[in-house]
Amino acid sequence: LNELSFNFDKFVPNQNNILFQGVASVSTTGVLQVTKVTNTGIKRALYAAPIHAWDDDSETGKVASFATSFSFVVKEPPIQSRKADGVDGLAFFLAPANSQIPSGSSAGMFGLFCSSDYNSSNQIIAVEFDTYFGKAYNPWDPDFKHIGVDVNSIKSIKTVKWDWRNGDVANVVITYRAPTKSLTVSLSYPSDQTSNIVTASVDLKAILPEWVSVGFSAGVGNAAKFNHDILSWYFTSNLEPNNPAVNQAQ
């Protein structure tokens, strides 16, 4: 398939086109709960069908451009029940098809990585929305809550400060343009006119296998259990020639 699109305005319990790993689930109110206050550990939710990331069969060599948008809420528990600041965050990711949660990837590893090394065997591109930056536990993080672009490592290649708002709905748009190898992330809150934006150069074909899974992952520790809720999710991808000159000629 050269194109794939799906759209979830809301979710339903036992949704058959979402794969749940860990204890991720859908609430009776139609919210995809990647984590919730009563749980610790790692939770992931992936779209059930694989995505065609690139194709070498054509003369030009095709690589997928994609766009995704989703809304989510990160909400902290009452202060009297917390032992620390927010731990740890939420990530949108692309990984090998049928990817499983790696061992040793809890808490600040977001259920994606086993270490902070740039290991090409990971084959992961992720966008993290990180609410925790304690240097004692996450020495790779900047000294602020942030949005980061991760390539084969939890140590982001690009970050931008995230003005996180407890319990508010955040709207995210992520686009990837294959001809320019440009990944752009924008996060905004409906009540605000400003956006948090980060752009990074990412060679999708060099990082990912031909077929990938897309989804969300979150890790929480024992110190502070935050809710990470996905309210809606849209995704579309399209294979196109991996050559700007070819695209301009079409």
Curated annotation (Swiss-Prot):
Residues that hold Ca(2+) according to the record: D130, Y132, N138, D141
PANTHER family, A to Z: CONCANAVALIN A-LIKE LECTIN FAMILY PROTEIN, LECTIN
Keyword Manganese appears in the UniProt entry: yes
The organism of origin for this protein: Laburnum alpinum
UniProt-recorded Gene Ontology molecular function terms: carbohydrate binding; metal ion binding
Binding residues for Mn(2+): E128, D130, D141, H146
Name of the featured protein: Lectin 1
Glycosylation sites: N119
Top-level taxon: Eukaryota
Annotated function: Di-N-acetylchitobiose specific lectin.
Similarity remark: Belongs to the leguminous lectin family.
Alphabetic keyword roster: Calcium, Glycoprotein, Lectin, Manganese, Metal-binding
